[in-house]
Amino acid sequence: MPQPAPLDFVVVGLNHQTAPVEVRERVAVRPEEEGALLGHLARHADEVLLLATCNRTEVYLAGVHGDPLAAFEGAWGHALLDHLYVYRGEAAVRHLYRVTAGLDSLVIGETQIQGQVKRAWQSARERGLSGTLMNKVVQGALAAGKRVRSHTGLSDKVVSVSSAAVELAQAALGELSQRRALILGAGETAELTLTHLRAAGVQDVLVVNRTAERARALAEKLGGRACPAEELSAALPEVDVVIASSAAPHYVVTAQNVREALAGRPGRAMFLIDISVPRILDPEIASVPGAHLYNLDDLTAVVQRNMQSRRAALPQAEAIIRELGSDLSRWYLTRETQLARQAELALACD
């Protein structure tokens, strides 16, 4: 009887550990680009899942034909080899399990990634790109994420990118209750950021989004003030902290905007934290006197301080990942063996 084929599952990608934000933003995926990217990748595999977050862009492939590295680089048109990793077979399965459980995140144990994986899978299914193997692997990944969070203390009092950004502002400014803040964006991360700002005592938070209705809805929900996007420049002199968590094809706040804002508030510094990928705060802001600019990569120190209390949960979490990864490999081997036997019987009948 023919030997069962090896587990035909591959991941190729980059993340915050292999690429700085300057590289990650080059492969960030905007919603309007997703269909074309998946169409390109589908020429290299039977099943495709594209997972793109602020800290990673990864392509999961099943039924691969061709070089997955070339498929990734061809999709984005950049020479990215120095930043890419490739895992195959069970190693690729375990990687997705670790990602979904929050073990591979900048903020270890964060929970947003579970929903991001689920949405990526839904997108693949809607386009007919998730078949038997991809469905099984992703279902296993979602189960792994739930099991790690419910059976370990990894997600207890977990810090998020949003809370880390607010903590960074507190470290720079001290007590925030007398400070004014401005959030760029109205999505899930912006909502978390506003929640943490309010918890830190900030009474006055402006919410700016290019869709005014979304800004109003978020402000009303959590006690902020909606600010029309066209009034952003006028609002900047009022605020001490700007946290950007939105998507835009260009810089929303430029160095000149900040220079003019600071001229209207002499002697008062401004702290700007960009947790968007691609970044929407002009990096040149860092050269403006009185402006202090941070991005996602600057949050590492904050995250590491908050990680100490959860390190004890890591061995148990990794053991769960190994166990469930092995279960998937056994399922695949059993399935392939059965298919091989069926093929052999069919030949014998002929």
Curated annotation (Swiss-Prot):
Stored CDD domains: NAD_bind_Glutamyl_tRNA_reduct
Keyword rRNA-binding: no
Binding of substrate, residues: 53-56, 105, 110-112, 116
Alphabetized SUPFAM superfamilies for the sequence: Glutamyl tRNA-reductase catalytic, N-terminal domain, NAD(P)-binding Rossmann-fold domains
Highest taxon of the lineage: Bacteria
UniProt site (Important for activity): 95
Recorded catalytic activity of this chain's protein: (S)-4-amino-5-oxopentanoate + tRNA(Glu) + NADP(+) = L-glutamyl-tRNA(Glu) + NADPH + H(+)
Annotated GO biological process: protoporphyrinogen IX biosynthetic process from glutamate
Active site, per annotation: 54
Enzyme Commission designation: 1.2.1.70
A GO molecular function held by the record: glutamyl-tRNA reductase activity
InterPro entries linked to this entry: 4pyrrol_synth_GluRdtase, 4pyrrol_synth_GluRdtase_N, GluRdtase_CS, GluRdtase_N_sf, NAD(P)-bd_dom_sf, Shikm_DH/Glu-tRNA_Rdtase
Binding site for NADP(+): 185-190
Keywords associated with the record: NADP, Oxidoreductase, Porphyrin biosynthesis
HAMAP family listed in its UniProt record: Glu_tRNA_reductase
Leftover remarks: During catalysis, the active site Cys acts as a nucleophile attacking the alpha-carbonyl group of tRNA-bound glutamate with the formation of a thioester intermediate between enzyme and glutamate, and the concomitant release of tRNA(Glu). The thioester intermediate is finally reduced by direct hydride transfer from NADPH, to form the product GSA.
Family as reported in the entry's similarity comment: Belongs to the glutamyl-tRNA reductase family.
Binding partners and assembly: Homodimer.
Record's comment describing the protein's domains: Possesses an unusual extended V-shaped dimeric structure with each monomer consisting of three distinct domains arranged along a curved 'spinal' alpha-helix. The N-terminal catalytic domain specifically recognizes the glutamate moiety of the substrate. The second domain is the NADPH-binding domain, and the third C-terminal domain is responsible for dimerization.
Protein name per UniProt: Glutamyl-tRNA reductase
Organism: Deinococcus radiodurans (strain ATCC 13939 / DSM 20539 / JCM 16871 / CCUG 27074 / LMG 4051 / NBRC 15346 / NCIMB 9279 / VKM B-1422 / R1)
